[in-house]
């Protein structure tokens, strides 16, 4: 864990994404290390917010015509909004979602599917560093067994051992009269 730069909330989010939070128990020293890292990043963020408050924010550029107003294609092509700051994970507020261009939205969606933090958390706390976190098994590479036949749903009469196959097998069994 000493080599990881993940904060407390990053670790919790990664474990909950993989539904493995019940398998990990942190010691008191590990919790202190995780919270100290998050305190350090919080202090860095507060300092940068104070410096940003002095600088005026640029005006938002309309990138969709349906929002009203005119769209400048040159300005819209150069605009990039930050979508990684959302506190609710993949939730993006409606106003911000409407302002995203299709390229920004695809980057946000790709980041949501990527699960980079979850896999890093799995490597550090569950699988140990250096191991592959989730092995990929390809169905193409696996050999097909000729012996493995398709399983068929069959109802067998207990008295005469008659077999009924198909979608109407229950009704056929009810109408069946055993010949003993």
UniProtKB/Swiss-Prot annotation:
A Gene Ontology BP annotation from the UniProt entry? transcription elongation by RNA polymerase II
Quote the InterPro entries the UniProt record gives. Rsc14
The domain of life for this entry's organism is Eukaryota
Instruction: Tell me where it mainly resides.
Output: nucleus
Give the UniProt keywords, A-Z.
Chromatin regulator, Nucleus, Transcription, Transcription regulation
GO cellular component, as recorded: chromatin; RSC-type complex
Give the location in the cell: Nucleus
According to its UniProt entry, what is the function of this protein? Component of the chromatin structure-remodeling complex (RSC), which is involved in transcription regulation and nucleosome positioning. RSC is responsible for the transfer of a histone octamer from a nucleosome core particle to naked DNA. The reaction requires ATP and involves an activated RSC-nucleosome intermediate. Remodeling reaction also involves DNA translocation, DNA twist and conformational change.
Listed under subunit, the entry gives: Interacts with STH1, RSC3 and ARP9. Component of the two forms of the RSC complex composed of at least either RSC1 or RSC2, and ARP7, ARP9, LDB7, NPL6, RSC3, RSC30, RSC4, RSC58, RSC6, RSC8, RSC9, SFH1, STH1, HTL1 and probably RTT102. The complexes interact with histone and histone variant components of centromeric chromatin. Component of a fungal-specific module (HTL1-LDB7-NPL6-RSC3-RSC30) within the RSC complex.
Name this polypeptide is given:
Chromatin structure-remodeling complex protein RSC14
Per the UniProt record, the source organism is Saccharomyces cerevisiae (strain ATCC 204508 / S288c) (Baker's yeast)
């Amino acid at each position: 864990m000493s080599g990881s730069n993940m904060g407390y909330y990053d670790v919790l989010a990664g474990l909950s994404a993989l539904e493995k939070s019940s398998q990990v128990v942190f010691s008191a020293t590990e919790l202190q290390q995780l919270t100290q890292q998050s305190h350090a990043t919080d202090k860095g963020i507060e300092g940068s917010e104070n410096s940003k408050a002095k600088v005026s924010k640029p005006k938002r550029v309309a990138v969709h015509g349906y929002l009203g107003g005119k769209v400048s294609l040159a300005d819209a092509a150069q605009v990039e909004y930050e979508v990684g700051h959302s506190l609710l994970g993949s939730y993006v507020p409606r106003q911000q979602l409407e302002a995203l261009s299709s390229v920004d939205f695809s980057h946000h969606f790709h980041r949501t599917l990527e699960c980079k933090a979850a896999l890093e958390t799995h490597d550090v706390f569950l699988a140990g560093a250096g191991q592959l976190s989730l092995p990929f098994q390809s169905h193409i590479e696996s050999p097909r067994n000729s012996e493995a036949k398709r399983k068929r749903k069959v109802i067998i009469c207990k008295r005469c051992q008659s077999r009924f196959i198909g979608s109407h097998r229950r009704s056929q069994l009810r109408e069946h009269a055993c010949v003993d």
